[in-house]
Amino acid sequence: MELKGTKTEQNLMTAFAGESQARNKYTYFASKARKEGFEQIAAIFEETAANEKEHAKLWFKELCGGESPDTAANLEAAAEGENFEWTDMYAEFAKTAKEEGFARLAYLFEAVGKIEKAHEERYRKLLENVKDGKVFIADDVVIWQCTNCGHIHVGKEAPKVCPVCAHPQAYFQRVANNY
């Protein structure tokens, strides 16, 4: 049976959005509870947020035909989403806020729009690396670090297996010294 265009598809999208928003709210609520000295309540909010994440994942998978798309497709979808946010959504929100006299909110919408543009660029570069087989291979010698144990390797390619902790190449990333 075809899901596309049905009321059930709309319900799945609503359920996914609702569970996603609940997860974020509960995470924020946990932070506030912790700041106010309520560790148990914070932990319960965090536990519930984790449950909501799993509910959202369930509905997302159903919307995707039962399985999440591969990383290349996810990077493309993420880039497209970020593009919409900075070119359309936040630009329109900023315009409306200005027209209605909310200068601070207009500024924030514009500022977040710039961040979303950077997100799009990052996703597009990562997608290019995936397509070109350059996630773990560089044209020049670079510094690679195992994100599990911290092992440093210098070379054009990340090790297939970390020589210290035996984690696979997937745990290596290029080091960006920003200090």
Which role does the model predict for each range below?
Residues 1-179:
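Non-heme di-metal
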